[in-house]
């Protein structure tokens, strides 16, 4: 169970204590608590990332958004993870159950990819960001080839090779 506690601006300094209080009252396996001020989070969502970060700092808030934390907690509670596909002009995240094989992950993109799965070229997201492109990763030998038994990891960047 994910408890998202909406607090007022005047309670922001006490967010961690509020989370601990709710966690102690509702303790148990599969319970997570995140306190956030929905009013401020809505305002931050309309800002450019750099402006939002500066606003968070001005308010004395942690740099990490509690909304992002709520999403991570929800994924964990539901046993989900994300993998990514990246092209020249687009990067997209896909959600799969933790423990999904490469063909199962391919099927989340399109059923034909699962049916005709041959192999996957896989890299870590942080390595892709550092390299700047999949082509550069391949050139550096950092793109590894995986077969049908590969278990997709959270944050993998996957290029599916298939044939129908």
What are these regions (language model features)?
Residues 1-153, 158-164:
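C-terminal-of-GTPase-core extension/linker across diverse P-loop GTPases
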């Amino acid at each position: 169970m994910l408890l998202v506690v909406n607090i007022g601006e005047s309670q922001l300094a006490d967010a961690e204590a509020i989370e601990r209080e709710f966690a102690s009252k509702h303790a148990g396996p599969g319970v997570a608590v995140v306190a956030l001020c929905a009013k401020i989070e809505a305002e931050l969502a309309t800002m450019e990332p750099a402006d939002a970060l500066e606003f968070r700092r001005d308010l004395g808030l942690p740099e990490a958004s509690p909304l992002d934390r709520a999403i991570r907690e929800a994924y964990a509670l539901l046993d989900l993870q994300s993998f990514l596909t990246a092209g020249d002009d687009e990067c997209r995240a896909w959600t799969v159950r933790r423990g999904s094989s490469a063909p199962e992950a391919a099927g989340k993109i399109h059923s034909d990819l699962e049916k005709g799965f041959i192999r996957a070229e896989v890299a870590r997201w942080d390595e892709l960001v550092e390299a700047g492109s999949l082509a550069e990763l391949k050139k550096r030998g950092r793109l590894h080839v995986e077969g049908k038994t590969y278990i997709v990891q959270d944050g993998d960047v996957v290029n599916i090779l298939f044939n129908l």
